[in-house]
Amino acid sequence: MKKLLSILAVFGVSAVGTTSVVACNKTESNNLSIVKTIAVPATVATANPKQVTNAEIKTALEANVLKAVQGVVKTATAADFQFDVYQDNKGTSLTTINLEEGNVEVYVQITPAKDKTVVIGETGYIKVTLPKIKVDISGVVIDQQIVEIKAADPKQVTKDELNAVNTYATLASAVLEAIKNKAPNAGASDFEITNNCDAGDYSAQKDVKVTVKAKDESPNISGEFKVNAKVKATLAPPKAG
């Protein structure tokens, strides 16, 4: 009997020990250490893309950090936690970064707000790659352009013939120069030109609006602007043969 009790005692101690270990290793459901990723913001609003401040970065990240915390505690609000942004995963302070030349990696750590217990613990240093800032071209202004295209009949110019307005060399050159003055890294492949021309009589100059729009996939620019143009069609030479 003593042997049996001894065996049971041994198993009892072992069971208690195992339970204790499990309890120590269990992560509470509201522990911020559960957060491993933070979504990247579409852009970072800044006064100077070459010197994006810590405060501007935090503003850009606020909504996505909140979503990450709410993945731990659904009812959490921005008042329940605080976060900061660092240069690396060692907590080196960050003052400014340059987002004009390319993407930049920063590290975010989230901790509970003072005297708040909705969330506990803290995250590690979570890497977030901030996207290169696209220059907004919506403020670009270009002088009125004179555009001359060829048509089979200048009095009955078709929509297809009017597409030549979009690639007219002088217009395209003026647009590119104006954009590069604001966004030096931009090129002709970053934007597209369209017009509001209706088919009809262009034997005399006609006022039209040309739209210059940054392509969605452009890594350098965003936005669009309008250009006033006077379009005239002249008779196209007859096709050979």
Curated annotation (Swiss-Prot):
Topology of this chain in the membrane: Lipid-anchor
Keyword Glycoprotein attached: no
Lipidation residue positions, type N-palmitoyl cysteine: 24
PTM annotation: Palmitate and stearate are the major lipid components.
Signal peptide residue numbers: 1-23
Assigned GO CC terms: plasma membrane
Superkingdom, taxonomy of origin: Bacteria
Family of this protein: Belongs to the spiralin family.
Stated role: Major membrane protein of spiroplasma.
Name this protein carries in UniProt: Spiralin
Organism annotation: Spiroplasma citri
Gene: spi
